[in-house]
Amino acid sequence: MEGKFAISESTNLLQRIKDFTQSVVVDLAEGRSPKISINQFRNYCMNPEADCLCSSDKPKGQEIFTLKKEPQTYRIDMLLRVLLIVQQLLQENRHASKRDIYYMHPSAFKAQSIVDRAIGDICILFQCSRYNLNVVSVGNGLVMGWLKFREAGRKFDCLNSLNTAYPVPVLVEEVEDIVSLAEYILVVEKETVFQRLANDMFCKTNRCIVITGRGYPDVSTRRFLRLLMEKLHLPVHCLVDCDPYGFEILATYRFGSMQMAYDIESLRAPDMKWLGAFPSDSEVYSVPKQCLLPLTEEDKKRTEAMLLRCYLKREMPQWRLELETMLKRGVKFEIEALSVHSLSFLSEVYIPSKIRREVSSP
């Protein structure tokens, strides 16, 4: 929904919030039950054979809430409570995290997930992104390499120290003056791999930007990556563990998450390439058997479920084939297992050779 709603239009959003809450009050005052319609979005279905429209950003259904049923009454109550907090944030030009909002009324919200759902409902209702509400994520991501930029007046000069980790900015919409001499962006799943590359001075010998979400990526990391893609037009490669969890992280970067399917266009990296680790890498790079772990029953169930996602067959059949191979072999391994013969193997051999292969492929 980026572009539909800039932060500079917060006054317009405030007026729409005021109009909405006023209409709810009028309904209640006149003895009518408020009727709130929330569109439903999804970025995939679990039928690979379906001729579906999951790849579009159009609603896939609609929920209608009234005060006639207790669960719906509670959901409306939570939506309005969070909406009043959002209204205050916008009026005072302040920002808050989802956790901050939860602790404003912990006894009423009961769980963080209640706040998360209410924020999602508000974004859908007002056709905006979370950042338009001045609701920010507590960033976990790190970045290093051939890049410098400003965020809300703060200077981030990664170019001055190529292998030093900088925090991914929280206020991504306020990032400006982006300058880069990089040839590509490398996203790595884990901080341990990020630090390994930093220790090996990877960015000194490879003109790139390295980003990690330190596991499952938060909104700030995904939004920042999307911004860099839009501004720099660089190829993006992703390195994750060869296991179901690593693939889920890869899929979240590339296709977005189901939880935020309503805002998929501002968060996904549609041209991201899977650099590794692939099931076949264990043989190609002679990973010792003691580094190969058996897939658990939970791993197998998760992999089988991921194989049903429509976007794999439609857009990335080769990724689906790799998943099937992992399931057939029944083993998984971490990226670090590739470095069993040499600590610098990832930075000196594996990643550069994979990048060269991607560059030379048609």
Curated annotation (Swiss-Prot):
Location of the active site: 103
EC top class named in words: isomerase
EC assignment: 5.6.2.2
Subcellular compartments: Nucleus
Entry keyword set: DNA-binding, Isomerase, Magnesium, Meiosis, Metal-binding, Nucleus, Topoisomerase
Tissue: Expressed in shoots, young seedlings, flowers and reproductive tissues. Not found in roots or rosette leaves.
Catalytic activity: ATP-dependent breakage, passage and rejoining of double-stranded DNA
InterPro entries documented for this protein: Meiotic_Spo11, Spo11/TopoVI_A, Spo11/TopoVI_A_N, Spo11/TopoVI_A_sf, TOPRIM_Topo6A/Spo11, WH-like_DNA-bd_sf
One GO CC term on file: nucleus
GO terms for MF: ATP binding; DNA binding; DNA topoisomerase type II (double strand cut, ATP-hydrolyzing) activity; metal ion binding
Cofactor dependency: Mg(2+)
GO biological process: chiasma assembly; double-strand break repair via homologous recombination; homologous chromosome pairing at meiosis; meiotic DNA double-strand break formation; reciprocal meiotic recombination
Residues at which Mg(2+) binds: 189, 241
Cited function: Component of a topoisomerase 6 complex specifically required for meiotic recombination. Together with MTOPVIB, mediates DNA cleavage that forms the double-strand breaks (DSB) that initiate meiotic recombination. The complex promotes relaxation of negative and positive supercoiled DNA and DNA decatenation through cleavage and ligation cycles.
Family: Belongs to the TOP6A family.
Record note on quaternary structure: Heterotetramer of 2 SPO11 (SPO11-1 and/or SPO11-2) and 2 MTOPVIB chains. Interacts with MTOPVIB. May form a heterodimer with SPO11-2. Interacts with PRD1. Does not interact with TOP6B.
The name this protein goes by in its record: Meiotic recombination protein SPO11-1
Organism: Arabidopsis thaliana
Gene this chain is encoded by: SPO11-1
